[in-house]
Amino acid sequence: MPRPPVVARTLPALRRALDDLRRRNATVALVPTMGALHDGHLSLVRLAKRRAAKVVVSVFVNPTQFAPHEDFGSYPRTWKADVAKLAAENVDLIWNPDVKTMYPEGFATRIGVDGPAIAGLEDRFRPHFFGGVATVVGKLFLQVRPDVAIFGSKDFQQLRVVTRMAADLDLGVKVIGAPTIRERDGLAMSSRNVYLTPEQRQVAPTLYRAMKETAKLLKAGRSAEAALAAGAKMITDAGFALDYLEARHAESLAPVGSIKDGPIRLLVAAKLGNTRLIDNVAV
């Protein structure tokens, strides 16, 4: 039987648990999550175990990164299953605060983000999002004080924003991006995939196929404008409502015009019915 992780729900309990973990100067890795864990999350946990002696997983559905019309209330919450999965991975500590612990009455301080990493893409459609992400991740870093933190590359713009924030604010955390984990048909694993109907689930992998085709055209020398137009047509022809398909510099996230401006990352967001999916691939 796997050893159940310690669960902390208050800051004093978290500090006591962290003091125990850090005996003999053990290194600590943090994997921030919103729960509803799948194999993609567990791949982050496994990478964390390779990068540090002790692993902390936070499970907190952060209300400040949801707009009023988004799915905060219906976001999947699978606590018992999450704990069982983390126990099977021998996670040392689960940090599971409630909203009042993270945002007590009178809370008035937020982290703002700026620069090319936030320009366009998700910020255009969810202007509240990265302020909420930066604030909650900044708090998690200060609460846990990990040596390393593991984030999935599926949320690539988020990864770049968090990496920049940790460096700019001298938080002393090494942010590591882990590869996107995909289903056999190429669909990126996501907690929101449960919203897809069976018919939509059959269509959803088109998003990944369209990005691969766009990358192929870029590598063949087509301009970003032409390659992106071809990829966008594949996506909309499949029934998606496309928010964006863009080619950006993989480090700065500045827009690019051709393969010569690389390294390039393709980033996409589109809605299939009521479900919004995001993904990205390297070129």
Swiss-Prot record:
It catalyses: (R)-pantoate + beta-alanine + ATP = (R)-pantothenate + AMP + diphosphate + H(+). InterPro entries: Pantoate_ligase (IPR003721), Pantoate_ligase_C (IPR042176), Rossmann-like_a/b/a_fold (IPR014729). The keyword Cell membrane does not apply. Pfam families: Pantoate_ligase. (R)-pantoate binds at residues 65, 158. Beta-alanine binds at residue 65. GO terms for biological process: pantothenate biosynthetic process. It is found in: Cytoplasm. Its EC number is 6.3.2.1. ATP binds at residues 34-41, 152-155, 181, 189-192. Keywords: ATP-binding, Cytoplasm, Ligase, Nucleotide-binding, Pantothenate biosynthesis. GO terms for molecular function: ATP binding; pantoate-beta-alanine ligase activity. The active site is at residue 41. The reaction proceeds by a bi uni uni bi ping pong mechanism. Belongs to the pantothenate synthetase family. Catalyzes the condensation of pantoate with beta-alanine in an ATP-dependent reaction via a pantoyl-adenylate intermediate. PANTHER family: CYTIDYLATE KINASE/PANTOATE-BETA-ALANINE LIGASE (PTHR21299), PANTOATE--BETA-ALANINE LIGASE (PTHR21299:SF1). This is Pantothenate synthetase.
